[in-house]
């Protein structure tokens, strides 16, 4: 099940977390969805998909997402929304976007937590990624890390049609891990609060009574009093590293990057 942990749950495994282990969200890259099941907060990561993130913020600022249905919600898979016609295939007035299925970023911008002979895995902010192995990277003239978003629970992607370059306005939230989507759909960020609301959405294709995105805003555009007052466990900090190591010990060979769930607290 997809969960986001608030401070009460987080404290169970993070008693030693210091103030420096937490970080604030960037209001310009935080999307706030007011839904019929409650508030959902998404941390957008332009490092993964600058054009996709720019488009989603533009549509939020234009009010395109307000009132749209979660028109396809599948248990153990995804919740889709964002089409102005409230069904698959709808688009905004803006042109389709090129695929952003992989990225290249400075290695210092990423936190690697798993090193294998065939790949590396880690986080940029709260969003998980997989990257080529260090050995393969060393063979390339470009020193930047080459990776792609990992479709773990809570990850947000852009929907499309059969054409890889047909992403436009549709977004979807993973209700469970589906790594087969890696390299196939643009990753734009991850839910950092409100996972319970995503899990509570009415299920169906379409649901009999669909839930709605009542209002979608970029946090920077909200009055200070209405912005999410959240801090996220910093993936670059000691407490995060210790948390990941504890999961590795507990899960052994079965450990997956998708086992690492978002930890947040109210500030």
Show where each model-derived region lies.
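Bacterial N-terminal signal peptides that target proteins for export
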Residues: 1-6
